Amino acid sequence: MIVGLGTDIVEIARIETRISEVVEKELQTNRLAKRVLTPSELDIFIKSSNPGRYLAKRFAAKEAAAKALGTGIGRGVSFQHIEISNNENGAPIVTFSAGAAERLAALGGVKGHLSIADEKHYATATVILES
């Protein structure tokens, strides 16, 4: 049974503007990236050939997940409580911890399904929470 559904869209240029003035060595200190990404996501971001697009997709995915939880970011759920990774085939995976995991359990949810897409100007993500 579906216990939550969330979607988000991000204009990639807005994210790229926030990191465009930063040289590669300083990507790890970018305030937006440090706020949104977990340590393992930050490692991938730093090595990415297109860090703005990577960050935009993760931002959209985490916002969609927070919306599916019914809280948005805040009220006990932070960007750091939602991690986006990929399975061996490259499909995106959403993992919840701390406040996000507590909220998922309160909804009776056990698993999240994530789809991420991007085109020239936009990144979008949808999360479905399943009981």
From Swiss-Prot:
The UniProt entry's sequence similarity note says:
Belongs to the P-Pant transferase superfamily. AcpS family.
Cellular-component GO terms for this entry: cytoplasm
> Does the record's keyword annotation contain Protein biosynthesis?
no
Single GO BP term: fatty acid biosynthetic process
> MF terms per GO, please?
holo-[acyl-carrier-protein] synthase activity; magnesium ion binding
Q: Which residues form the signal peptide?
A: none
Query: SUPFAM superfamilies from the xrefs?
Result: 4'-phosphopantetheinyl transferase
Pfam family of the protein (one): ACPS
**Needed co-factor(s):** Mg(2+)
Where, by residue number, does Mg(2+) bind?
D8, E63
Report which superkingdom the organism of origin falls in: Bacteria
Per its record, how is this protein called by name? Answer: Holo-[acyl-carrier-protein] synthase
The coding gene here is: acpS
Keyword annotations for this protein?
Cytoplasm, Fatty acid biosynthesis, Fatty acid metabolism, Lipid biosynthesis, Lipid metabolism, Magnesium, Metal-binding, Transferase
Q: Where in the cell is it found?
A: Cytoplasm
For this protein, what is the EC number? 2.7.8.7
Give the protein's biological function: Transfers the 4'-phosphopantetheine moiety from coenzyme A to a Ser of acyl-carrier-protein.
Write down the chemical reaction(s) this protein catalyses.
apo-[ACP] + CoA = holo-[ACP] + adenosine 3',5'-bisphosphate + H(+)
What organism does the record attribute this protein to?
Shewanella piezotolerans (strain WP3 / JCM 13877)
UniProt-listed HAMAP family: AcpS
